[in-house]
């Protein structure tokens, strides 16, 4: 089932709106990557083996009072031992991270740190470049959406709408390319941070989160909208060229002595007169045998034009009538 030009424009607007919504949601959320951190438990934190926890002084002659201070807390100058082995001595903290924050959840509490500060100094420039690219991606996507809406709801003629359609397609393609580059740069920075970031942050395991999925879904919808818009423009231009060849052929068959400038003027007059009254001039007369009526009785201002009474040309593709 072939969609009409107006339906294709509406579909492009919807796809662009979805892409814009998903890109904003992904950029300002911190669920691009999720996983767990493996950290050593504080001394005597284990409820199961707390009875085996001992604090021994550095000096073998130290008494039990040396292991604790006056407040009853463990003395930081004392070596602390616990008898937990394997994974019993580690705590696994869930974390999620995005462009702006990396948050850890442990025992019902969540603590967040700036991901920009966590990234290595060598990667901060790339990270800021990815942030700027994401901003440009959203801005260009918004501009493309506004142009598509203008082309869809505008009451201007068909030719002006076609120009807006072409510009919207170019803007949307550029935004999609910027978004793809931004996503890839961020993931590169994240993987470097996993290996070279702070030791207390490096994840034990990690996987892609729903923000990452939204970002690439936004890119897919963006490129789909741009391809659909560009397809509408290209299809219309090819139809223009084909119909113009048929038009010029029929005009020359009916009047072989007509000046080429006159033929070009007749074509432009026909296109603009039709596009100002109908949405799609090519749906106005389907088929090769449809007549094309052009009034040239008022043409007197072109060089070499012959001033005559009002007359018309009824041209058909088979060349039998003129």
From Swiss-Prot:
It is found in: Cell membrane; Synapse. Residues 1-8, 147-166, 231-322 are cytoplasmic. Its main location: membrane. Keywords: Cell membrane, Membrane, Synapse, Transmembrane, Transmembrane helix. The chain crosses the membrane at residues 9-29, 126-146, 167-187, 210-230. The keyword Secreted does not apply. It is a multi-pass membrane protein. GO terms for cellular component: plasma membrane; synapse. Belongs to the GSG1 family. As a component of the AMPAR complex, modifies AMPA receptor (AMPAR) gating. Component of the AMPAR complex. This is Germ cell-specific gene 1-like protein.
